[in-house]
């Protein structure tokens, strides 16, 4: 019912962003509302987190939409957008790719 406590210096992920990587290495942001027609919470809870955790069987319909929208992607990257908790308040932290899912993994999940 209550959120867990957070401490000084702790890194907290506040959002995830998904990118479709093209064969030439360009990263295309998969926009929740424009590309998938879903709101932030559905994007975060029903797509980004399962993708991050490689639970691809749970997100087949959304993966199908991604394949349709980005037919040449070679990889999906999950990037976190964290904050660091400090006594002076939260501060932005370095973003990083926390999961990379290959096109082959996506195709396998869609079978």
Residue ranges and their predicted role:
Residues 7-111:
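Extracytosolic and intramembrane catalytic regions of membrane-associated proteins
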């Amino acid at each position: 019912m209550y959120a867990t406590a957070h401490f000084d210096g702790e890194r907290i992920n506040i959002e995830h962003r998904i990118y479709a990587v093209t064969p030439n290495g360009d990263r295309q942001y998969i926009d929740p509302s424009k590309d998938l027609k879903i709101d932030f919470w559905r994007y975060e809870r029903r797509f980004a987190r399962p993708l991050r955790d490689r639970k691809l069987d749970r997100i087949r319909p959304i993966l199908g939409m991604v394949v349709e929208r980005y037919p040449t992607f070679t990889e999906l990257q999950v990037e976190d957008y964290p904050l660091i908790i400090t006594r002076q308040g939260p501060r932005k932290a370095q973003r990083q790719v926390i999961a990379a899912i290959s096109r082959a993994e996506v195709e396998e999940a869609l079978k």
